[in-house]
Curated annotation (Swiss-Prot):
Species whose genome carries this gene: Staphylococcus haemolyticus (strain JCSC1435)
CDD domains: M20_PepV (cd03888)
Zinc is among the record's keywords: yes
Alphabetical GO biological process terms: L-arginine biosynthetic process; proteolysis
Protein name: Putative dipeptidase SH1171
Keyword check for Protease: yes
Family the entry assigns: Belongs to the peptidase M20A family.
GO molecular function: acetylornithine deacetylase activity; dipeptidase activity; metallopeptidase activity; zinc ion binding
Swiss-Prot/TrEMBL keywords: Dipeptidase, Hydrolase, Metal-binding, Metalloprotease, Protease, Zinc
Length: 469
């Protein structure tokens, strides 16, 4: 029944999704204002969702242009459907324009198709189809739309300061059949707190280093500028050998008398950095083989001592595992250095329940002072958990099973979704077991089958929760 209903709307679903995907809704603090709190792109995407909702007869409510909601249904209780329309930067290497969606016979290709614009449109259409059917609602529905999920969650933080908290809800921002637990998440910076004088003149001086744009992405590009006193050719040959040895891509050029080294890695979501190749850490590893100026020497040695090839907190002394939630993970998402200020590393740490977070951070903060580094702690989100046997979770899982025939059990992830804003919130799709996960990677796409199947699952789930009651 539900798949047949979705078939009637397939063309509209694709058209509305294409419109949303065409908006480059990447956070841009350089253009932030009261009207565009995290930049014009996210605001434009939020307004777009209001426009299609108003076109379809729904009420909308805006909260300071950083978040808002689409309202449907009636009743005392509220089901929250928590979505986001901001996206991570596109990065390099796409086969097409990431913000000019390509529709093939079986897929849509663009940044945000999986994370989270495709699932947002699927969930929206589930509510729209039920509303068009004029069902007898037993609950209200708030489709809550955020614009800063990929960075600091300023959107939901502001939204829930003044707006009603849903009784229960789901975020269509992960995998099916349901995600009933999420690791704790924090970001912190490891900052070089002083520069050192050189006792002897070094052969090489690291002038600058840049890699990464987001804490929650593995950097796929790194660049270093190095002043080479002599034997430039030797360094270039040594670099080429390093690239060959580690099966990496990169290049070296001379610019204004400085050697510019670039290295390419593989970007993946920071919740499992072991699946990617951190361009920044590999380039620092190479640079560590040079006779550097002292400040740079301390910077690259710190990287190798605590960060390089350590995805699970091993080198930081934070290795920890639980059977329910898995391992601590550490992603080095942003690296920068200049020869006047020194360097810094931006870390995304994810941890399971029962990990002694505060104790670990305090110990590590004290330890790294001996190497000239301070730890600056950012926002901390505690681990989130809902019993998978809760009737709410079971209704979601039943809808998934009815639509797919797959009997998989709910599980936990290292990612973080808006579901953790709610006491009774879980992540629910829209990835399937056989979906190719290119979230935060080049050539991100969603298949039409996945998009429409997710819509039918959301249809049955919302009907079960908000019409049957």
């Amino acid at each position: 029944m539900w798949k047949e209903k979705v078939q009637e709307y397939e063309g509209q679903i694709i058209d509305d999704l294409k419109g949303l995907l065409s908006i480059e809704s990447v956070r841009d603090d350089s253009k932030a204002s009261d009207e565009t709190p995290v930049g014009p792109g996210p605001r434009q995407a939020l307004d777009y969702m209001y426009e299609i909702a108003q076109r379809d007869g729904f009420s909308t409510h805006d909260v300071d242009h950083i978040a808002g909601r689409i309202e449907a249904g009636k009743g005392d209780d509220v089901l929250g459907v928590l979505c986001h329309v901001d996206v991570v930067p596109a990065g390099d290497g796409w086969d097409s324009d990431p913000f000019n969606p390509v529709v093939t016979d079986d897929a849509i290709i663009a940044r945000g198709t999986l994370d989270d614009k495709g699932p947002t449109i699927a969930a929206y259409y589930a509510v729209k189809i039920l509303n068009d059917m004029k069902v007898d609602w037993k609950k209200r529905i708030h489709i809550i739309i955020g614009t800063d999920e990929e960075s600091d969650w300023k959107c939901t933080e502001r939204y829930f300061q003044t707006e009603e908290m849903p009784t229960l809800g789901f975020a269509p921002d992960a995998e099916f059949p349901a995600i009933h637990g999420e690791k704790g998440i924090t970001t912190f910076d490891l900052v070089q707190n002083s520069t050192s004088e050189d006792q002897d003149e070094p052969d090489y001086e690291l002038i600058s280093f840049e890699s990464g744009q987001r804490y929650n992405m593995v950097p796929d590009h790194a660049q270093a500028r190095v002043f080479v006193k002599e034997n430039m050719t030797d360094v270039v040959q040594h670099f080429e050998h390093y690239l060959d040895q580690h099966k990496l891509q990169g290049e070296s050029v001379v610019d204004s008398g400085e050697l510019v080294l670039t290295l390419e890695g593989k970007a993946v979501h920071g919740m499992d950095p072991s699946l990617g190749v951190n361009a920044g850490l590999y380039l620092l590893d190479f640079i560590s083989t040079l006779n550097l100026n002292q400040t740079a020497r301390e910077f690259v040695d710190f990287s190798n001592r605590y960060l390089h090839e350590s995805h699970f907190g091993e080198k930081m002394g934070m290795k920890f595992h639980t059977d329910v939630m898995g391992d601590v993970t550490t992603n080095v998402g942003i690296i920068s250095y200049d020869n006047k200020q020194g360097g810094r590393f931006g870390i995304n740490l994810r941890y399971p329940q029962k990990f002694e977070f505060e104790e670990a951070i305090q110990r590590f903060t004290k330890e790294i002072k001996a190497y000239g580094f301070d730890l600056e702690l950012g926002k901390v989100q505690q681990p989130h958990f809902v019993d998978k046997n809760d009737p709410f979770v079971q209704k979601l899982v039943k809808a998934y099973r009815n639509q797919t025939g797959d009997m998989s059990e709910p599980y936990t992830i290292g990612g973080g979704t808006y579901a953790r804003n709610l006491d009774k919130g879980v992540a629910f799709g829209a990835m399937f077991e056989d979906s190719e996960d290119l979230m935060h990677q080049k050539n991100e796409y969603i298949t039409k089958k996945q998009l429409f199947n997710a819509t039918s699952i959301y249809l049955e789930a919302i009907y079960s929760l908000c019409v049957e009651g």
